[in-house]
Curated annotation (Swiss-Prot):
Protein name: Ribonuclease
Keywords, sorted A to Z: Hydrolase, Nuclease
GO molecular function terms noted in the UniProt entry: RNA nuclease activity; tRNA-specific ribonuclease activity
EC number(s) reported in the record: 3.1.-.-
Top-rank EC class of the record's enzyme: hydrolase
Transmembrane segments: none
Record organism: Thelephora ganbajun (Ganba fungus)
pH behavior: Optimum pH is 6-7.
Quaternary data: Monomer.
Other information: Inhibits HIV-1 reverse transcriptase with an IC(50) of 300 nM.
Intrachain disulfide bonds: none
Amino acid sequence: DADIAVWAPPVNAQN
């Protein structure tokens, strides 16, 4: 879900 990672920290982008 790279699209959601925009608002989430890159470190937890995989979550």
